[in-house]
Amino acid sequence: MNGTLVYEDYISLYNRKKIKSLSFKKSQIQPSSIDLSLSEECYEIKTSFLSPDNKVRDKLRKIYSKKISLKTPKIFKKNKTYIVRLNETLNLSNSITGHCNPKSSTGRLNIFCRTILDYCDEYEKIPNNYKGEMFLEITTRSFDIKISKGDKLNQMRLRKKINYYLNDRDLKKINKKTPLIFTDKKNIIENGLRVSVDLSNNDEVCAYVAKKTSLKINFSKINFYEIKKFWKPLMPKNNCLIIEKNKFYILKSKEKICIPSNLAGEMIPYDTGIGDFRAHYAGFFDPGFGDPEGSYAVLEVKTNELPFILEDGQTIARIKYEKLNKKTSVVYGSNINSNYQNQKLALSKHFK
């Protein structure tokens, strides 16, 4: 069937060598996506690029400034850009397309990453029936990050033939039967599901802003770092918060959201109609997220041009929903060690 591939499909693709990797682990497969892992092959570059007319490797040879091995962990310095070959290669067929996104933990550390493929004129895009290597461009923007071979910074979602994104009419019908969002607001569905920011309590922490620090974070260390060394907690003033230029914030949604087990979701990362800021790095929501009682969406926010005032209940992002190609036997949650089920205002899994 057409639609977004599920857990069982990724198992099949790997078994049939449509996804190849010498270091593949079954734990990389999520309900409607697959985590991609870093190889040891890494390059420092001074300019970003796409490779619409060449292989990425051929273009890299001409522009890289330094070759690095990730056999041993290396420090990726803030605001420097690196290209790492991913362990996974693709040999797709049967009209399969897709795209990639940073994982939640990557976005919450303000690590900007995007996938580059051979003969492809768009970042993050998996062209129809793609065959070839995959590379990841990585720029860490708030902290120096220790990166190792095998780390998983991004994820891939594949589809059979076309996207089956649901229109507003379909979403409203589903929302009446099985809530997609828990709120008393009206007009919550408009060009997707509208998600607003929670600045309702002036006496509680509503956000974190990344501190300037020389301390380093090892991407492999989980539940390890003290929050106060890297983040400053913020409280709203008069139910408002000023987003300062070039600073990085973690906030949460006012509403709880739900991704039913027969659907997948994706946050739209930048919407000029909502405001001049990036409202989310990590896009994918797997089936079962927040099911059945809802879970808050955590939002990564940054503005590049001017300071921006956010008010309580202001729309900050949109979620679009898409149909799965079949019912999945695995959903997001504790059974597959999902890190952010039932989350509140949550930093990345690296902090305790």
Model-derived regions: residue spans:
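DUTPase catalytic domain/fold
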Residues: 1-352
